[in-house]
């Protein structure tokens, strides 16, 4: 699915160099089809890096995807130029009267911060409540999963004593589920979180269906039966080098981090890591776009009435 973005967005050239199909707005205007409108609420500090990661995963299917980037934190960014934010991001007030086919809420490095201490917690609540009536399907990633479980289901924050960092094996629980269609029986995916997601907690306190778990019994992928919300507790969007960057950052900060599990060859941080989860990440996002967004979203977005099974 070629992603449709503004011609000047830095990700255009970056992804084209990787042979990723990116369609600029000027080119897309010549195709007589309705693109899927996908809103990305980017909560990560390094916004350009995160844009590249998610746009890469949204790009590999025959339909157009019209991407809109959203920010809700008005504070000055230390990691992203103000010019970039002003040129390519909208504020919630700019889009609150619109409807979208899909919404992705990214992770955020807030695993040890209490919800009420998050500077934009009221805005997070506002967006999630708004999405119920304005978005066909929402995908939450890592910290956003924890935030959504609290806001939508009242589940208190669950925190691990140590950070889960590395590339872990998972297994699917429902081979015929649409979101896991085409998955291998077991697959690898990266995690980088303090948040804890025991599968028993999800089963006991929500009506969500767990579709894949870690080998340790943590919920990795789960969703509502009506496909309106989906959750992934890891980071399938990560580049090969992302965990390494986080590890060396923490080393320089004197935090004495554990070496990410099953990541560096021979467990040696001097060795260059490889991405062993790329096919999984691409298939997950393609399935979400197809089965959770495209197949149920209304053609006319002015009338938000998803087609439910």
From Swiss-Prot:
Keyword Oxidoreductase applies: no
Catalytic activity: L-homoserine + succinyl-CoA = O-succinyl-L-homoserine + CoA
Cellular component terms per the entry's GO annotation: cytoplasm
Main EC class the enzyme belongs to: transferase
Subcellular location: Cytoplasm
A GO molecular-function annotation: homoserine O-succinyltransferase activity
GO biological process: L-methionine biosynthetic process from homoserine via O-succinyl-L-homoserine and cystathionine
Pfam families xrefs: HTS
Annotated site residues (Important for acyl-CoA specificity) in this chain: 111
Main localization of the protein described in the UniProt heading: cytoplasm
Domain of life: Bacteria
UniProt EC number: 2.3.1.46
Record site: Important for substrate specificity: 192
Residues at the active site: 142 (acyl-thioester intermediate), 235 (proton acceptor), 237
Pathway(s): Amino-acid biosynthesis; L-methionine biosynthesis via de novo pathway; O-succinyl-L-homoserine from L-homoserine: step 1/1
Record has Amino-acid biosynthesis as a keyword: yes
UniProt KW keywords: Acyltransferase, Amino-acid biosynthesis, Cytoplasm, Methionine biosynthesis, Transferase
Binding site for substrate: 163, 192, 249
Function: Transfers a succinyl group from succinyl-CoA to L-homoserine, forming succinyl-L-homoserine.
Assembly notes: Homodimer.
UniProt xrefs under HAMAP family: MetA_acyltransf (MF_00295)
PANTHER family registered for this protein in UniProt: HOMOSERINE O-SUCCINYLTRANSFERASE (PTHR20919:SF0)
Family designation: Belongs to the MetA family.
The protein, known as: Homoserine O-succinyltransferase
Taxonomic lineage from the root: Bacteria, Pseudomonadati, Pseudomonadota, Gammaproteobacteria, Enterobacterales
């Amino acid at each position: 699915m070629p992603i449709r973005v503004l011609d000047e967005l830095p990700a255009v050239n970056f992804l084209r160099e990787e042979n990723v199909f990116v369609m600029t707005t000027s080119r897309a205007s010549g195709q007589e089809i309705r693109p899927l409108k996908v809103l990305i609420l980017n909560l990560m500090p390094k916004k350009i890096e995160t844009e590249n990661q998610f746009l890469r995963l949204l790009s590999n299917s025959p339909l157009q995807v019209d991407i809109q980037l959203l920010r809700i934190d008005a504070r000055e960014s230390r990691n992203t130029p103000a010019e970039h934010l002003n040129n390519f991001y909208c504020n919630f007030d700019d889009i609150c009267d619109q409807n979208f086919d899909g919404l992705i809420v990214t992770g955020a490095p807030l695993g040890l911060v209490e919800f009420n201490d998050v500077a934009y917690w009221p805005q997070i609540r506002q967006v999630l409540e708004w999405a119920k009536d304005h978005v066909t399907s929402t995908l939450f990633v890592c910290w956003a999963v924890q935030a959504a479980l609290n806001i939508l289901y009242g589940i208190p924050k669950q925190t691990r004593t140590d950070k889960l960092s590395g590339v872990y094996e998972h297994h699917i629980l429902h081979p015929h589920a649409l979101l896991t269609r085409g998955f291998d029986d077991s697959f690898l995916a990266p995690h980088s979180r303090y948040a804890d997601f025991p599968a028993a907690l999800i089963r006991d306190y929500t009506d969500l269906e767990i579709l894949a778990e870690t080998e340790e019994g943590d919920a990795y992928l789960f969703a509502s039966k009506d496909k309106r919300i989906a959750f992934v507790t890891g980071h399938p969007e990560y580049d090969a080098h992302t965990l390494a960057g986080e590890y060396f950052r923490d080393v320089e900060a004197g935090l004495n981090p554990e070496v990410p599990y099953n990541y560096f060859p021979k467990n040696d941080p001097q060795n260059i890591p490889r991405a062993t989860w790329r096919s999984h990440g691409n298939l997950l996002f393609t399935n979400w776009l197809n089965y959770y967004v495209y197949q149920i979203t209304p053609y006319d977005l002015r009338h938000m009435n998803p087609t439910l099974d």
